[in-house]
Amino acid sequence: GSFVIRRPDSAVLKFAPISSIADIQRCFEFRTNVESKAAHLAALRRTPEQLAQIRHCYDLIDEANARQMLATEEDYRLHLAITEAASNHYYYTVLKSLHESIKEGMNLTRNLSLMAPKERLRLVQDEHLAIVEAIAEQDGERAEAAMRSHIDKARHRMFEGTR
């Protein structure tokens, strides 16, 4: 026999909007755990095409940075491409459902940073490069550690004004 699976309404997959600083903290905490494991799996499972997409997203951030733009959407797309390369649709779906919350956090981090914008952009892109290189080299442990470090540092930049 055959059966039909009905996909849940997209509204079901949306998280509650960020309504406080505590919500932003919780989102960072959640992302640290989800995205670091996704990066680990992406390093082990990515296809050459997925790696090319990850690199393309990284390059788009560089291009936006050169134009001195915030690159929030490009940054989000890089993270999304990494979850897609994990080849587990749950990681991708969760990150997709957090789109607005993640962008709010990224915008706040960029706008509240005490660092000079160019310096901050370079640091963030260096963190991204560490993740991309680990995924390219299929080093799951290093990819996981690099993603965890990246999200933790973003949280520190926002809440503590540190690098």
Question: What do these predicted regions represent?
Answer:
Residues 1-2, 10, 66-67, 116-119:
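Short secondary-structure boundary micro-motifs
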Residues 1-34, 40, 44, 163:
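Short linear motifs at protein or domain termini
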Residues 6-8, 106-113:
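Short regulatory "switch" loops immediately downstream of catalytic or recognition motifs
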Residues 13-17, 110-119:
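Short helix-coil transition/hinge motifs at the ends and kinks of transmembrane helices
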Residues 27-109, 127-130, 145-156, 161:
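Conserved amphipathic alpha-helical segments that form helical-bundle/coiled-coil interaction surfaces
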Residues 118-146:
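A late-sequence structural motif
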